[in-house]
Amino acid sequence: MSYISGARSLPDEQVRIASTKMDGIGPKKAIQLRYRLGISGNIKMNELTKYQIDQIEQMIAQDHVVHWELKRGERADIERLISISRYRGIRHQDGSPLRGQRTHTNARTARKQIRK
C-alpha cells in the first residue's frame, strides 16, 4: 500500500482508479495525468517505478489543488460567511441544514449532537 498526495492506494489497483481517490482529481483529470506521463491504461500501482510515482506526485502538486488545499479553502470560505453574518454562515454555526431542507423532522440527530 502506498500513499500519493495523502491518498492511500492499493497495490493491485489501476493507476486511473487510484488517482481518482485523491481529493481534487476526478476521472477526467486522472486520464489527463496518465496521458501526460505516458502511463498505460491498465497498469497497476505496484507495477509503477519509484521515478513514475515521483513524477505523479510532482505533477499533482504542480497543476492540481490537492487535499489539504481544498480543505483549507473550504474552511476559509465558511469562516468568511460566519464573519460577515451571512445566513449560510449562521446555519453553519448552528449545525443546521444550509440549503432549505426540512428541519422539523429531519436533521434532528445532527442538531442533538451539536447541542450536547
UniProtKB/Swiss-Prot annotation:
Keywords: Mitochondrion, Ribonucleoprotein, Ribosomal protein, RNA-binding, rRNA-binding. It comes from the Eukaryota. Residues 92-116 are annotated as: Disordered. InterPro entries: Rbsml_uS13_C, Ribosomal_uS13, Ribosomal_uS13-like_H2TH, Ribosomal_uS13_CS. The keyword rRNA-binding applies. Pfam families: Ribosomal_S13 (PF00416). Transmembrane segments: none annotated. GO terms for biological process: translation. GO terms for molecular function: rRNA binding; structural constituent of ribosome. One of its GO terms (cellular component) is ribonucleoprotein complex. Part of the small ribosomal subunit. Belongs to the universal ribosomal protein uS13 family. Located at the top of the head of the small subunit, it contacts several helices of the 18S rRNA. This is Small ribosomal subunit protein uS13m. The gene is RPS13.
